[in-house]
Amino acid sequence: MLQNGTVISGTLIEKPHSFSTACNIATQIIAQVASSQYGGQSISLTHLAPFVEVSRQKIRGEVARELEELGVSASPEKVREVVEDRLRDEIRRGVQTIQYQVVTLMTTNGQAPFVTVFMYLNEARTPQEKHDLAMIVEETLRQRYEGVKNEAGVWITPAFPKLIYVCLLYTSPSPRDAHES
């Protein structure tokens, strides 16, 4: 739905042009699905990972234009550093959108949506996408650890979305096992 676009409430939603927009659209999809069915929804952060690269390219273009307008040159390393700093901020905003949208959504049946977020780095198709997915997962876990403030201003851990992180441990066979095969 994110890669190919979708229709929500009679409005065509095209492929997002940034990570934060992809996060916003994902929460709109969650809201629509949750309002028309009982039970929960699961999403994988892997579906959002390609939009990190979309934002990276967009930010890189913005930085290049800003440097040109200022008549300033910067080393490729410095440009990359500025781009990655802005990208991390974009990821923070996008993850925060998901967090707050899911926490504050009420479906038409009067319930908060039962959302599960799946995080598995090996779903990524390329090394760059895996790196980008790792940044999303890191930010998701950081924000969950921090929590959200309740109406009294006290930090709490929200009930949703539920987080599932897959961690595969690889143990190499002992040298003796290799000789026996």
Language-model segment annotations:
Residues 117:
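Conserved, mostly hydrophobic/aromatic
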Residues 1-62, 66, 110:
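Catalytic alpha/beta core of large soluble enzyme barrels
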Residues 120-122:
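Active-site beta-loop-alpha junctions enriched in small/polar residues
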Residues 36, 61-62, 68, 90-111, ...:
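Structured alpha-helical segments in the cores of large, soluble enzyme domains
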Residues 170-175:
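Conserved small/polar residues in nucleotide/adenosyl-binding loops
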Residues 125-134:
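A short acidic (Asp/Glu
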Residues 74-92:
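Intrinsically disordered, low-complexity acidic Ser/Thr-rich regulatory segments
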